[in-house]
């Protein structure tokens, strides 16, 4: 990946300056290669001064010492981001040449992220003086959103102001490391670069080196635990967690348990304390308990680590499980510690009486679990022990104890799977279809996922804006004939929503909604007038964006139609209560209200206020349902809930919220798999045993609140993405609309220099058939198979098969368009 033509890179060379202001200063900082130059003897790790070489200003590189680790710093790279090459830009450019740093200059904001990801500069200097020409803080956030920028130093050049300074918090919150008050003097810029190189850059280099240390700890077969001076667990490697039976990360931040010690162990604690409090490591054998309560014998080495102020700041415990045949004998020894610390100024002088006896070691020296009292870890166990997943893990741990090696290894793999956070989400490996993998990841993630695509340019009609020429109907008896004809067969699955869209001038929701709600007796249940319901529909539809190709009121009407169709199926009518039907129809109506035509990932990457408000979690879904209730409740003329009893309203509200949140794709596989395991499989099992006797059991099982919630979530999910199950022409039109909306998002991401969440939806490189095939394969088929098994929807499944064959046929012909070329 290369940089744009406007970016110029200086070659690595030594420059001589005879200018009076460019006085030669020779400092040991990260540079091109070791040379014979003068260095400051006062700086740590620098050699003695040497004679100047004809006044030439040179900078050399030095090895960096980090504890016992020593590594080499490559030539430092600097990226200058200025909209114009003024004196300040030139000052930094000349300073880079003077220091021998590689320098890249870019004047085009849209090329910055690409250039940075290509070169991975150590320092980025951004011009923050002219916000109208360049939004420096947004650019900085964009850079920080890249995983490669974690150790990059970003400097903002600001104006020199005479008035009182304001807080730097917004500046730092944007991701800047420090600021530089404008000063075009070359030596001022040079000195700034030297300070950065010897300070922040070197510190970041050491932090990067920590990755290798943590890798060694993570892969070590020895169990290692690190605690603070107050015995708060700061780190436990996988070997430790596996040895003690804990889940990954479960112990971090927890205080070690305070456990009563029996009399036989008192001498052991005294021996440990006598060692560690005088900066000596202790090594010996003692007993401890695993999470499941089993006692194990361990060979333990406890090492105190001296830190700031010459005091003990950490304890490192290295543990090996002893062979079960060993005798229970405790042997201890003190060894003078020679571990490297971050402060060698002095030894530990503060011998705290309670350094280990009540916390770190005491939790490991108890032989009887009944002696446990109200310690922090015991409280944690009491909270978690009732969790079903914890019970499963404990049972598997117990089964491993006396199992053969192959069985133990297989159970370990089972535990690894159970300990993942996404138990219901599929995991893809390198052999999977990259296109499908990227599509699935992009639709299910609030973070960044990369896609690939093929060539395609969509030619679709521009939808006209919402028209006000069509009068709002006073009642269902006041509907114009053309619209009445368009909604005549709305109870049928093959109902043409696009015909209604044209007839209503892009206002299908209010007309379809009034008829559907009347069919289900919504006004009677809500105890509201048809006038109130009509005003509510008008208000909701006006908050859908008609400018969106896909997420507009036509999509809402389509989802409402599908939901009503599902509610009319016999199995659903037998299962759901009246309030469930009402909740489902309202949820379908409002499920995408005020949708901006952009994905959750886009809003999170752009720092949108909704993403901030909802903590980057289910951003749009939370907004849709919250806004729907806000708009409804703040206006009496639209408040369809006004006459409801308090308890009924709260039940209805909770059900609506639950259904709208279920449309978030990050939980797709969780909802589908729960439905299969909790509804489909029990039904199949009961029906196959004794059909007559199990009929009542089946009804009772389906009527539970948990089962009804699963069914309602599945219903709105299927209604929301039912496009591939519609007649072919409808399916093609929906594919065109969603593709155009995603194309528009990709265009805007590139324009704003944001991470491109779905590169597969580039209007110049997209294969619509491939995207539809992947979507059907990974999201639609299994879900509708499960839904069909419960509801019985043969017509939908036939459409799904026909549409899949259509897209497959286009793809096999290497076509990227919506339709084959005319013959």
Swiss-Prot record:
Q: Hydrolase as a keyword?
A: yes
Q: What class of enzyme is it?
A: hydrolase
What is the regulatory mechanism acting on its activity? Inhibited by dipyridimole. Insensitive to selective PDE inhibitor rolipram and to the non-selective inhibitor, IBMX.
Q: Basic and acidic residues bias: where?
A: 10-19
Where does the PDEase domain lie? Answer: 475-814
What are the GO MF terms of this UniProt record?
3',5'-cyclic-AMP phosphodiesterase activity; 3',5'-cyclic-GMP phosphodiesterase activity; kinase binding; metal ion binding; protein kinase activator activity
**What does it catalyze?**
3',5'-cyclic AMP + H2O = AMP + H(+)
List the PROSITE patterns hit by this protein, alphabetically: PAS, PDEASE_I_1, PDEASE_I_2
Q: Which domain of life is it from?
A: Eukaryota
Which tissue types show expression of this protein?
A: Expressed in multiple tissues, with highest levels in testis, followed by liver, heart, skeletal muscle, and kidney. In the testis, expressed specifically in the seminiferous tubules, in postmitotic pachytene spermatocytes. Low expression, if any, in lung, smooth muscle, pancreas, thyroid, thymus, submaxillary gland, spleen, prostate, epididymus, uterus.
Q: What's the EC number here? A: 3.1.4.53
Ranges of residues in domain PAS: 209-280
* Annotated active site: 551 (proton donor)
Outcome of gene disruption:
Reduced phosphorylation of Mapk1/Erk2 and Mapk3/Erk1, both basal levels and those induced by EGF treatment.
Residues where Phosphotyrosine is found: 456
Question: Any idea where the PAC domain is?
Answer: 283-325
**The keyword GTP-binding is annotated on this UniProt entry:** no
Residue positions annotated to bind a divalent metal cation 1 are 555, 591-592, 720
Give the residue ranges for region: Disordered: 1-55, 338-373
Residues bearing Phosphoserine?
355, 382, 452
Cofactor list = a divalent metal cation
Which family does the record claim for this protein?
A: Belongs to the cyclic nucleotide phosphodiesterase family. PDE8 subfamily.
Record text on subunit structure and interactions: Interacts with RAF1. The interaction promotes RAF1 activity.
The record's note on its domains = Composed of a C-terminal catalytic domain containing two putative divalent metal sites and an N-terminal regulatory domain.
Q: What protein name is recorded for this chain?
A: High affinity cAMP-specific and IBMX-insensitive 3',5'-cyclic phosphodiesterase 8A
**Natural source organism:** Mus musculus (Mouse)
Which gene is this protein's source? Pde8a
